[in-house]
């Protein structure tokens, strides 16, 4: 029998990165999830994080983190610093990601 591993030991969380991992929990039937996706996409253009999408119905991670109210996101900086946000409404997703993720430095024509 294989030894069980903790969810934070998966490759998604152990791969070297500069920003946090943001896991979006969604389902095909979630009416509010498309708006959350658009908010995450908008913040991804200006802030540093790795974005992963999990189906809340089939995700063992969602089960382990007791995700019950969608839209939901996990913001994972480290084993000691992570937070699951659930039942997000309005601009909650944008507000959370702007607070949790650092701005990406972009060299453009205005630089």
Give residue spans per PLM region.
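N-terminal leader/targeting and pre-domain segments
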Residues: 1-21, 96-111
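Local sequence-structure signature of Cys/Sec-based thiol-disulfide redox active-site neighborhoods
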Residues: 6-43
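Short amphipathic alpha-helix with an adjacent loop that forms part of the alpha/beta core around
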Residues: 12-14, 61-65
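Hydrophobic beta-strand anchors of alpha/beta hydrolase catalytic cores
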Residues: 22-23, 50, 73
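Structural microenvironment flanking redox-active thiols in thiol-disulfide oxidoreductases
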Residues: 56-63, 99
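Structural micro-motif
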Residues: 65-76
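Non-catalytic, surface beta->alpha helical segment in thiol-disulfide oxidoreductase systems
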Residues: 75-111
